[in-house]
Structure formats: C-alpha cells, structure tokens
Swiss-Prot record:
HAMAP family: NhaA. The gene is nhaA3. This is Na(+)/H(+) antiporter NhaA 3. GO terms for molecular function: sodium:proton antiporter activity. InterPro entries: Na/H_antiporter_dom_sf, NhaA. It comes from the Bacteria. GO terms for biological process: regulation of pH. It catalyses: Na(+)(in) + 2 H(+)(out) = Na(+)(out) + 2 H(+)(in). It is a multi-pass membrane protein. It is found in: Cell inner membrane. GO terms for cellular component: plasma membrane. The keyword Ion transport applies. The chain crosses the membrane at residues 32-52, 87-107, 114-134, 145-165, 174-194, 202-222, 233-253, 318-338, 347-367, 382-402, 417-437. It comes from Acidiphilium cryptum (strain JF-5).
C-alpha cells in the first residue's frame, strides 16, 4: 500500500510519493506552451524525412491501410488516414469549440471592445489571402482551394511566442490568441459549408435527433461523460453518412457544452465546512455517514468546475500530444521537388499566407483603430502587431486539413508544399521582426553578446 508518511507536503497541499516526483515533472512538461508546437514540428520533420527517403512507398502505404468493422449488414471501412482526418480530428475540433466557448463566456472575448481588434484583424487575415489566392488561381484547377489560405495554426503561433518568452507584450499574446480563435471558427464553417459532399437528409435528420437527445439529457441533469461520448459517437456515424464533414459534430457538441458548474462555490464551501467540522486526529470513525461526507465533498469539488473546463483539461493533452502529431505524420509527408514548389497552386498558397495574411491583418487592424471600431491593447505597438501578423501566416494544421478536402493527388502535394514553405517563411519573418523591435525601455527585444563579452 502506498503511504505518505515520508512525504512533507506544504500546508494545504496533498501528500506526495516518490512516483509523484516523476509524474509532476511530466505534467509541468506538458504545460509548457511551446511543447505542443515542438512535438507537432518534430512529427512534421519525421513525415517529410520518410516521404523523401527510400522508405517513402512503405510510409505512404501505411496510411492507406484499411481499418473497419462489420456487424451483419452494417460495414464501416476507412483507411488509417481517413480515420485520423475524419475521426480523431473531431476531438481536435471539439477542443477548439470548447476553447471558443470558454473565451466567449469566461475569457478575453467577453469584452466587445477588447475583442473587436482581433475580430476585425481576423477578417482581414482571411479575406485578403483568399482574394489574393483567387486572383492567382481564377479559372485554374486549384481555384477550389480558396479556403486553404484562411486559417492560422494556434499551436505553432503559441510556440513561436514562447520562444520569445517574457519579451512578448501581454497585449500581443492576447491579440494573437483571440485572432486565432476567430480564425478557427471561420475555418470550421468553411469545412462544413464549402467542402461537404451531396447531403443524405435522412442520415442528417438522425444526427439532428441525436443532438436533441443530448440536449434533453443535459436538461435532465445527466452528468456521466461516458454517456455523452457514446451519444456523440452515434451522432458522428450519422453525420458521416449524411455527406457533411463529420468533424462538425465536434464543433456542435463543444459549443453545446455548459460553462457553469453543477455545484456553486457557496454550496462547495458549505460541504467543505461540514467535513472540516470533524475534529482532526487519527480517530476517524469510518462509519457510513463519515464516508458519505467525504464522497459528497469529492463530488462537489469535481462538479464545481464547469464541463467545459473539465473536458478541456482532460482531452487537451491527448489532442495536443496525440491527435495533432498523428495528423501531421499522416498528412505532412510530401515529396519535396522544385517542380512542386513552383507549381501555381503552391505559389498561390505561399502568396496568400506570406503576403496576404500580414497585409490583411495589419490593414484591417489599422482601419478598425482609425475608425474607432476597435482599440489597441496597452503595450501593443504597431511594430509588434506587424510582427504578430507575420506569424499568422503559419497555417499548417487547419490548412493541411482543408487542403485534404479541396485537392487530390499532385495538386494536393503542391498545396502541402506551399503550406509548409509559407509556415517556415512566416515564422522566421515574424520572429526576426519581433526580436528586432525595442522593448518599452528602448532596448531591443533580443540582444546577442559581443566578442568581448560586454553588452552594448
């Protein structure tokens, strides 16, 4: 039996064991903002390396492996890549929707004046790249890929900001994260509306009935998360059969998730005071009433957190360090060739991200502030905003996802090369500018050492 007699917890903290030293360090590792982006980058490098190696054929065929089940007349068969893109990515979209709802109800997006700049800038960061892409691809086979250049990859942007650490003004961090939330919401709508197949209305109606049932369970007070996941899986199957991209199920369920806890803070305080009223010591009776009080306290502590907060804390590590790297491995692998890089689709994608994104974000943000629609956060200079706008050209995850819906074969490979090249150029350009900008005290955000070891 594990005991805590050798542990020395601080007052008000839980006792610890030897294994906690390892698990707590790992938890801290997962909480580092840059880690998710670093793991995603590593998966991308692995995919690109294997796709341009002697093992490329085997690597590509791995993701085409058919996987499925058959029960009587019912058969569900998909390739491994499709299961990741359509199935596991539903969890990614679910997390995105949870973050959007949390920010709208509880976070930075509550204040219309604070969020106006991000909304206006995000609109420019989607419309200008899309317009530039369509101008270059009008009447061409790649015209259907207009949605590829709209999104911003939150994980990579956060990773870039984390590299700069405390040198990043808080206003810039809030601005970019809010902008990425708006971008994600728009990208979700693009996938649902712009890249769905012909619709089977019967299957779609079954999915809608499932959503009504989930809403009814919530109103009745059903709190077992497993029941909701089972219902969500059934709804996913129905929507997948309808022709609408099934990842939209994750979005809808995320937006339906309550933001209020079942147990109020006042009720929690009353329950904990009852437990604390027992005299301290080793004479805990262990009778049914005492055990019941502890069980109620445990449930109350858990249920004080809203379902949005609990689900985000539970699923986010799995999505960030499992689903997204798998997605990168399955989709980022593409043969790197000069012919692919100079393909008109690749060049249009690069132009949309590298030029369209920063121009659109900066111009619309300036117009928003100039017209009084939005205000610039304290500490966020125009130079910092331009540096952040350059980082929004990192499309990656959502861009690869939309490209997979819009293109096939050679055109898809060209779009992927454009996305990867644009992400590299945008990250280097954004970081370089942000490092060169002065702090509020007039010193550069980044300074290197001179040969003599003295600082300028």
């Amino acid at each position: 039996m594990i005991t805590d007699q050798n542990s020395k917890p601080q007052q008000g903290e839980l006792p610890t064991t030897h294994i906690d030293a390892l698990t707590n360090s790992f938890s801290q590792f997962l909480r580092i903002e840059a880690t998710s982006g670093a793991v995603l980058l590593l998966a991308t490098v692995v995919a690109l390396t294997l796709s341009n190696s002697p093992w490329s054929d085997g690597f590509r065929s791995l993701w085409e492996t058919p996987i499925g089940i058959q029960i009587g007349a019912f058969q569900f068969l998909r390739s491994l890549r499709d299961l990741i893109n359509d199935g596991l990515m539903t969890l990614f979209f679910f997390i995105v929707a949870l973050e959007i709802k949390r920010e709208v109800v509880l976070g930075e997006l509550r204040n219309p004046r604070m969020v106006a700049l991000s909304v206006v800038a995000a609109a420019g960061g989607m419309l200008v790249p899309m317009g530039l892409y369509l101008a270059l691809q009008h009447g061409q086979p790649g015209q259907h890929g207009w949605g590829v250049v709209m999104p911003t990859d939150t994980a990579f942007v956060i990773g870039c900001l984390a590299l700069l650490g405390s040198r990043v003004p808080p206003g810039l961090r809030v601005f970019l994260l809010s902008l990425a939330v708006v971008d994600d919401l728009a990208a979700i709508l693009v996938v649902a509306v712009g890249y769905s197949r012909s619709i089977d209305w019967t299957a779609l109606a079954l999915g809608a009935v499932g959503l009504v049932i989930i809403r009814g369970m919530a109103l009745l007070g059903v709190r077992n998360i497993r029941v909701y996941f089972l219902a969500g899986a059934i709804i996913w199957l129905a929507v997948n059969a309808s022709g609408i991209h099934a990842t939209i199920v994750g979005v809808i369920l995320g937006l339906m998730t309550p933001t209020a806890g079942w147990v109020s803070d006042q009720r929690l305080g009353e329950i904990l005071r009852k437990v604390l009223s027992y005299p301290p010591g080793d004479h805990w009776s262990g009778d049914t009433e005492d055990n019941r009080a502890l069980q109620v306290a445990g449930i109350a502590v858990r249920e004080t957190l809203s379902p949005v907060e609990r689900l985000e804390a539970m699923l986010h590590p799995w999505v960030a360090f499992g689903v997204m790297p798998l997605f990168a491995l399955a989709n980022a692998g593409v043969p790197i060739t000069i012919k692919g890089l100079i393909n008109p689709v690749s060049l249009a994608v690069m132009a949309g991200f590298v030029l369209g994104k920063p121009i659109g974000v900066t111009a619309f943000a300036w117009l928003g502030v100039r017209t009084g629609v939005a205000i610039r956060p304290a500490g966020l200079t125009w130079g910092g905003l331009v540096g952040g706008a350059l980082l929004t050209g990192i499309g990656f995850t959502m861009a690869l996802f939309i490209a997979g819906q819009a293109f096939q074969d050679a055109t898809l490979n060209a779009a992927k090369l454009g996305i990867l090249a644009a992400s590299v150029v945008s990250s280097v350009a954004g970081l370089t500018l942000l490092c060169a900008l002065p702090r509020s005290d007039g010193t550069p955000m980044f300074r290197g050492r001179r040969g003599g070891g003295e600082h300028p």
